[in-house]
């Protein structure tokens, strides 16, 4: 059986820009993408902690070290600069892959700098 699991999460990112006239997506500092293994053009789910909006888009790699979190296109209507968001990817895993799956989670500060990497291995099915 194939099931869908969280694969990576960027927790408490702050929106730095919003660009309605750009062609879709979210631009994220490439250093942050590397830390949680999110690739350019990968589908992401986003939750806005300020207004409860949940939506999906795809990723564009932003300038390294910039702290950039820019919602582009229609998604920009769902955020304000300064809003706190959570960005997640998911992976579809078979039963063998589920046991060793360990999501990557980066917790950010108010400047979108990584302050903690959380090992989600303790919360995986191998420990249930």
From Swiss-Prot:
Modified-residue entries (Pyruvic acid (Ser)), positions: 25
Record-given protein name: Aspartate 1-decarboxylase
Pathway linked to the protein: Cofactor biosynthesis; (R)-pantothenate biosynthesis; beta-alanine from L-aspartate: step 1/1
Enzyme Commission numbers on file: 4.1.1.11
Family: Belongs to the PanD family.
Primary location: cytoplasm
Cofactor binding remark: Binds 1 pyruvoyl group covalently per subunit.
Superkingdom classification of source: Bacteria
Function: Catalyzes the pyruvoyl-dependent decarboxylation of aspartate to produce beta-alanine.
